[in-house]
Amino acid sequence: MILISGYCLLVYSVILPVLISASKLCDLAELQRLNKNLKVDTESLPKYQWIAGQLEQNCMTADPASENMSDVIQLANQIYYKIGLIQLSNDQHLRAINTFEKIVFNETYKGSFGKLAEKRLQELYVDFGMWDKVHQKDDQYAKYLSLNETIRNKISSKDVSVEEDISELLRITPYDVNVLSTHIDVLFHKLAEEIDVSLAAAIILDYETILDKHLASLSIDTRLSIHYVISVLQTFVLNSDASFNIRKCLSIDMDYDKCKKLSLTISKLNKVNPSKRQILDPATYAFENKKFRSWDRIIEFYLKDKKPFITPMKILNKDTNFKNNYFFLEEIIKQLIEDVQLSRPLAKNLFEDPPITDGFVKPKSYYHTDYLVYIDSILCQASSMSPDVKRAKLAAPFCKKSLRHSLTLETWKHYQDAKSEQKPLPETVLSDVWNSNPHLLMYMVNSILNKSRSKPHSQFKKQLYDQINKFFQDNGLSESTNPYVMKNFRLLQKQLQTYKEHKHRNFNQQYFQQQQQQQQHQRHQAPPAAPNYDPKKDYYKILGVSPSASSKEIRKAYLNLTKKYHPDKIKANHNDKQESIHETMSQINEAYETLSDDDKRKEYDLSRSNPRRNTFPQGPRQNNMFKNPGSGFPFGNGFKMNFGL
């Protein structure tokens, strides 16, 4: 074994110098062959870098004036250019600048790749604000100088409108770290006035640009601070997922205290809250809602628990008067946002921020961040889903609060008009609110339907009901597994049925009024006629009741028949003629008018039992023995009267 090992060592010691010597040889043809077989992609980058290293170490040491040197430099420039393109595609712009500069700074031989690299470099110099390296300073440069002067003047005079000028400057030089940091500073100053989603999103975008384009030039502390700031704004202002930046922060330094505390806080809240899909995704809300059953626990956690969910000293670095976890969370959010405002990495605090009161910055909008509105929405949904009446009542006020801060002013006005005046909503309102927060739309619908119960029926009201009903049908909500959705659907159907019954009653009243007007008109034209009952007409049969039916049974039968032969049925039933249905309706009304009146009903019953009793068209015949409807004397022409004369 020792002999074999010794032999191998002897052979290796002989071959190694040969390998080292071979590696120092410039095999240009082999390097050119390798270059042709490679794609311009990230996977090929290490191979391009190896070829570039071979060229630099073994091939570019010869006399620059030698004949073979031009081929070496041409290959090197091609390799550098491809490396630069791959670096650009990976957002490594500063590295790409260094790579392209290797081509341009070689004065001996540039070739076509030298021109391409020069063009790329000039564009990158402008993007990064390296104006001292730009060859042709055109109108764009003049505008850059003008904007710079305007920005300096506005900053010195504390004019916050400078944000518009900085934004315009970033359109010229989007990756200039000095311009980006100035923009961040102005945005933070505005955020101290009002916690606004668009401002927070703009700050995050600027910091992400700096991380993407200037990562290599940033210190570890700066990178940690940036990831922390982005995480706070994403979580508690934008209500978006910050897990990527928290992981980045802790991967750089797992003991970084701010990111550790933030991660712990978010983790504890996520254990209580339902998933965002269950709250914000319409399909999950409507058809998978039964998967979450801890609605009572949510109300308990935020509004009833007597202990904070995390030790105040851990997250706030101070004690606080604890009322419940909802108000405690408000304090945490204020503290965290204040912290990122004060730290604002890379920014210089060029403006004087609003005064701090009671340890916190001015704006009341701390209470209206997207995250807190989201928590309000969770509590609202919990109030609708909880079987415990007391808990539900405790959480109910958060519905109106969440809705007020979720809707735009215009949409809020439309919602109020729908509630108070039953005005139909604009076409997009129902779908827009549904797609952003489905439970809030169901709360809106419930409020509108309950409010409209006491309102008079109108065409507007019918249009509003039809609009809501169409939305339910279009989205398949009649099949929802969410009990609150189904509660609203049943309430809507009940309201629609009430409206239909009201419409039927109105029609019948109008019909009776017309009949009464006609009768009054006839009475004015001719002497009133005595009741005329045709025993051939069976009013009981027409109404479908027995002769012993009560008044209540007669009325019920009548209402059912009026629904059946309502004018709306005329259009729906193509087999019956319009005149026939009107005739049927006339008989129904005639029968009901007689049988619903006790006196008329008695008279009708008597006429049916004694048909001859009702044979006189003008009422009962008067007992006048001297009146003969025929010709002559009523006792016959041969009858002789004897008056005792």
From Swiss-Prot:
The keyword Transmembrane applies. It is found in: Endoplasmic reticulum membrane; Nucleus membrane. Residues 597-606 have a biased composition (Basic and acidic residues). One of its GO terms (cellular component) is endoplasmic reticulum membrane. Residues 538-608 form the J domain. Residues 23-190 are cytoplasmic. It holds the Pfam family DnaJ. Residues 607-625 have a biased composition (Polar residues). Residues 511-536, 595-631 are annotated as: Disordered. It comes from the Eukaryota. The chain crosses the membrane at residues 191-211. The keyword Membrane applies. It is a single-pass type IV membrane protein. GO terms for molecular function: misfolded protein binding; protein-folding chaperone binding; unfolded protein binding. Present with 3180 molecules/cell in log phase SD medium. Acts as a DnaJ-like chaperone required for nuclear membrane fusion during mating. Interacts with MPS3. This is DnaJ-like chaperone JEM1. It comes from Saccharomyces cerevisiae (strain ATCC 204508 / S288c) (Baker's yeast). The lineage of its organism: Eukaryota, Fungi, Dikarya, Ascomycota, Saccharomycotina.
